[in-house]
Design a protein with these regions (language model features):
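HIT superfamily nucleotide-processing domains
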Residues: 2-146
Length: 146
């Protein structure tokens, strides 16, 4: 079981992705953050945004890392709505086990939304029926890395 507290986690899957030890489908990257396609296949276009500095969650994260993470969430969300045909996004985050956090590295989920997308009524939290398209196809549509 990985250490769930503090600022170091040698076994952190997201730290391994940042270091290039594990593959990812990058959507956006800068000096402080990385965003990439979620491999869960729960809904098309599901993107994760993480700080490159390891922190457990919002409760553990320093202000600068959190600010950079939120800045990237905004950039990616704007890209999805302005360039990829989505009407809006849901931004989801869980902090600690009781809230459903399963990977103990701060991460924000961006779920692209369209009217009548079948993920729930307008104003409701989305339900995730499963992805319709292959992740590679969606990745080509949403990536900001050229």
């Amino acid at each position: 079981v990985p250490e769930r507290h503090g600022n170091k986690m040698d076994n952190c899957i997201f730290c391994k992705i940042i270091k290039g030890e594990l593959p990812s489908r990058k959507v956006y990257e800068d000096e402080y953050t990385l965003s990439f396609m979620d491999i869960a296949k729960d809904v098309d276009g599901h993107i994760l945004v993480i700080p490159k500095e390891h922190c457990k969650n919002i409760l553990d994260c320093n202000y600068e890392a959190l600010r950079h993470t939120i800045d990237t969430v905004k950039k990616v969300s704007n890209h999805l709505t302005e360039n990829c045909g989505y009407d809006g996004v849901d931004v989801l985050n869980a902090n600690d086990e009781s809230a459903g956090q399963t990977v103990y590295h701060l991460h924000m989920h961006i779920i692209p939304r369209r009217y009548n997308d079948g993920l729930g009524e307008v104003g409701e939290w989305p339900s995730f029926p499963g992805a319709k398209y292959e992740i590679e196809e969606i990745h080509k549509q949403v990536t900001m890395i050229k």
